Swiss-Prot record:
<dbReference type="InterPro" id="IPR036412">
    <property type="entry name" value="HAD-like_sf"/>
</dbReference>
<dbReference type="InterPro" id="IPR006357">
    <property type="entry name" value="HAD-SF_hydro_IIA"/>
</dbReference>
<protein>
    <recommendedName>
        <fullName>Uncharacterized 45.4 kDa protein in thiaminase I 5'region</fullName>
    </recommendedName>
</protein>
<dbReference type="InterPro" id="IPR020476">
    <property type="entry name" value="Nudix_hydrolase"/>
</dbReference>
<dbReference type="InterPro" id="IPR023214">
    <property type="entry name" value="HAD_sf"/>
</dbReference>
<feature type="short sequence motif" description="Nudix box">
    <location>
        <begin position="305"/>
        <end position="326"/>
    </location>
</feature>
<dbReference type="InterPro" id="IPR015797">
    <property type="entry name" value="NUDIX_hydrolase-like_dom_sf"/>
</dbReference>
<dbReference type="GO" id="GO:0016791">
    <property type="term" value="F:phosphatase activity"/>
</dbReference>
<feature type="domain" description="Nudix hydrolase">
    <location>
        <begin position="273"/>
        <end position="406"/>
    </location>
</feature>
<keyword id="KW-0378">Hydrolase</keyword>
<dbReference type="InterPro" id="IPR000086">
    <property type="entry name" value="NUDIX_hydrolase_dom"/>
</dbReference>
<dbReference type="GO" id="GO:0005737">
    <property type="term" value="C:cytoplasm"/>
</dbReference>
<dbReference type="Pfam" id="PF13344">
    <property type="entry name" value="Hydrolase_6"/>
</dbReference>
<dbReference type="InterPro" id="IPR020084">
    <property type="entry name" value="NUDIX_hydrolase_CS"/>
</dbReference>
<dbReference type="Pfam" id="PF13242">
    <property type="entry name" value="Hydrolase_like"/>
</dbReference>
<dbReference type="Pfam" id="PF00293">
    <property type="entry name" value="NUDIX"/>
</dbReference>
Length: 413
């Protein structure tokens, strides 16, 4: 049973421990039994509008023993993160509770124009002027830190806006990527497990696959979904949102028949998004392959890139090769369609990860002149397929081999 399988129990709050003003069935008794059994308990919440003391007090009013230090809130975790990043002065785009967590962490709350970091939380009094001030300061070099990226939460009359709406507005206007602290991002979970030696004995309980389950899996711990309704599931066993077990409520921790599948992290990071991509294989008259050394990561690789709006994949690869090498090409055939996340998830220097579904084409040169350097390229040259340069993007030698195999059918990998 789950009680015996783990020593450290992490819990989301809303939808797992309580809903509104009421504790969920079995929650009070389950947490009491966990404590009497010597288990470590942590409560995780993305809500930045309550201090840890307030959250612990709310749990105690429901009959659930909880200490401040057992609460890991996105507001408190953000304050810890700012202290680690040595951002002494911060502008808080949030309410007085987030400001208090920052002050308690030794941070100075300052006017936006003097801030080393801008912290995005939430306040019902937030204005467009506040958001514009944050945009300007971040665009001018201040750190961009977000308590979480939740878009909305359920309200009495429908969805209510949450932190993620402000974060996205600032991101789009400033052109800067935020560091996000709360679930499903790793920092908050690491804070919860800060003094835990064996993470394999830790488990997360949540009701949201995208935040609770995926977040736990991103740091390599098991995750259990609380759900009493129909579950449609996820088709891939490697989907980070797929729970290791599903239970209706916390009384199931002592179910003798329940077994949990231990989470084995896949060989790729969980992507933030998925995009269509293209790659092109161009050869010279000696059968050598055209490669470019990318400016963004210093690796050699095939000419490649994104599909723009309004483009076909054929148009996209012709454009990419022209922009990156100066050559004009025509598409000869489709070599393969590549989507396996183990080779197709690419992590950028800012930490963002994208999964590409890449159409790889065999192309021939019909014009243009080779340009060896540019905004995206450090060098461009032809290489024998048996003597590819190093370092080279991991998946590209496989694509080259597929093209040289002269298969008449498109390859799917």
């Amino acid at each position: 049973m789950l009680f015996d399988a783990f020593d450290v129990f992490l819990f989301d709050l809303d939808g797992v421990i309580y809903v509104g003003p009421e504790a969920l069935p079995g929650a009070v008794e389950a947490l009491e039994r966990l404590r009497s059994g010597g288990k470590t308990i942590r409560f995780l919440t993305n809500n930045p509008c309550m201090t840890r003391e307030q959250t612990a007090a709310r749990l105690n009013r429901l009959g659930i023993e909880a200490a401040k230090d057992e609460v890991i809130s996105s507001g408190w975790a953000t304050a810890c993160c700012l202290r680690e990043r040595r951002a002494g002065s911060v502008y808080v785009l949030g309410d007085e509770h987030l400001e208090r967590e920052c002050r308690d962490a030794g941070l100075d709350i300052v006017d936006v124009n003097a801030a080393e970091a801008v912290v995005v939380g939430w306040s019902d009094d937030l204005t467009l002027r506040d958001i514009q001030s944050a945009v300007t300061r971040i665009a001018n070099g201040a750190q961009f830190i977000a308590t979480n990226a939740d878009w909305s939460f359920p309200g009495p009359d429908g969805p209510m806006m949450a932190v993620g709406t402000a974060v996205e507005a600032i991101k789009m206007a400033s052109g800067k990527t935020p560091y996000i602290v709360g679930k499903p991002y790793p920092y908050m979970f690491r804070q919860a497990l800060q003094h835990v030696e064996d993470w394999s004995r830790a488990v997360m309980f949540g009701d949201t696959p995208d935040a609770d389950i995926a977040g736990a899996h991103r740091i390599g711990i098991s995750a259990v979904l609380i759900s009493s309704g129909p579950y449609t599931g996820y088709s891939s066993a490697r989907d980070y949102r797929k729970p290791d077990a599903i239970i209706p409520d916390l009384r199931s921790l002592w179910d003798e028949e329940l077994r949990i599948e231990r989470w084995i992290p896949p060989a790729f990071p969980w992507p933030d998004d998925i995009k269509p991509g293209v790659a092109g294989i161009v050869m010279d008259e000696r059968g050598r392959v055209l490669l470019m050394k990318r400016a963004d990561n210093g690796c050699w690789g095939l000419p490649s890139g994104h599909v723009e709006r309004g483009e076909s994949v054929e148009e996209a690869i012709v454009r990419e090769i022209r922009e990156e090498t100066g050559l004009q090409v025509e598409v000869m055939r489709l070599v393969g369609l590549y989507s396996d996340p183990e080779s197709q998830v690419f992590t950028y220097p800012d930490g963002a990860a994208t999964q590409f579904v890449t159409a790889c084409f065999r192309c021939e040169t019909v014009g243009g002149a080779l340009v060896r350097t540019g905004a995206e390229t450090l060098d461009v040259n032809y290489f024998e397929a048996e003597r590819l340069p190093d370092p080279i993007l991991a998946m590209h030698p496989r694509w080259i081999a597929d093209a040289l195999a002269e298969e008449s059918l498109c390859i799917f990998r």
